């Protein structure tokens, strides 16, 4: 099993904010990848977006929370999206 920590966020852009929200999500994903904290995959459903984030470790997740560039992106997103559901940590089950 992987040592990565899987997090999932389901969100919708606020009215008139879709383009800016996606730009901010891309910026945040780039910051987190460049810092070696995580890797992201973004999916789109008919009415919502699903962001799947694979944190490299719990330590990386904590360190990312202190990164000024990441903090700036999260602050911007607070005005651009409405979060419908968040799974901070999902556990992999052996099949």
Segment roles from a protein language model:
Residues 2, 45-48:
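Short strand-connecting beta-turns/loops that link adjacent beta-strands
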Residues 3-7:
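Short structural boundary motif marking the start of a folded domain
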Residues 10-23:
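Short, surface-exposed ligand-recognition loops at beta-strand->loop->(often short) alpha-helix junctions
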Residues 15, 46, 58-59:
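Feature marks short, surface-exposed loop/turn motifs that line or immediately flank catalytic pockets
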Residues 27-39, 54-88:
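An amphipathic, aromatic/His-enriched active-site/gating alpha helix that lines ligand/cofactor pockets
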Residues 90-95:
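Short, low-order "capping/linker" segments at domain edges
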